[in-house]
Amino acid sequence: MLKSLQLQAQMTEEFGACVFDVTLDCEDGAPVGDEAAHAVLVAALARDAAPAARVGVRVHPVDHPAFANDMATIAGEAGHRLTHIMLPKVESVDDVLRAEKTLQGTSAAHLPLQVLIESPAAVHRAFEIAAHPRVQSLSFGLMDFVSAHGGAIPASAMASAGQFTHPLVVRAKLEIASACHAHGKVPSHCVVTEFSDMVAMQAAASRAAREFGYTRMWSIHPAQIRPILEAFGPTQDDIEVASKIIAAAADADWAPISFEGALHDRASFRYYWQVLERAHSTGRSLPAAVCPWFTPSVSLCP
């Protein structure tokens, strides 16, 4: 966990902005029987993180005996430094309501919740879960989802290639992405477990971003971060086109414009503005014409 925070600080200095979140883990990261001590450690790491750090915590599921203590210790002691709480194994909006009520009993009632969707029932309720105002993001938990099918889905569906071809996994991914976009939330793609295979990582991240509608992706190893940023960021050509269209639109007070023989109006302005936002959030360099809109992170601009 400490190495992840150190890498985040190094890349923030490199890019001039924080380009990825760190989620400290209490669910799978805590030894059985040592959950309370692990929560204290996580709270301390979050409190001591760099000022520009974006740090969240994955607590235990709401029905786990350690959940209440996780929330009291971590949200209560480090809530002012956290960007989010990650809830694993959410089955319905009732789990979100329970977590929200628990948060309200701490000094971090403002914190958004990021939710892990990890079962067929949760996928079925993804739209309802995404609609809750406290929910910021839905993430797909691939391995738990496959395991929840009792052997009906082969192990190959958990691999980097198979997870994009098995029909039930593909359906789940698309449902989650669609639910997020319907309610203005962030869809976060699942991990790739082959952490030493950068070709597989790049291919999976590219498909998640280009074909499945995901705007973020989990990593499980530092070597995966740059391929994810590369895949989820726009190309330099995309950035140049978006910058020219947005600059021309601003000059026209956002009235329809003609650009290279094509009509653009507010619908396409929104799209190209989102291209620039993705460029900024993934550490891309921005043309001078659009830099003023992205201050104070002026170091990304020429």
Which residues are covered by each model-predicted region?
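Expand to "…catalyze enediolate/carbanion chemistry for C-C bond making/breaking, isomerization
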Residues: 1-302
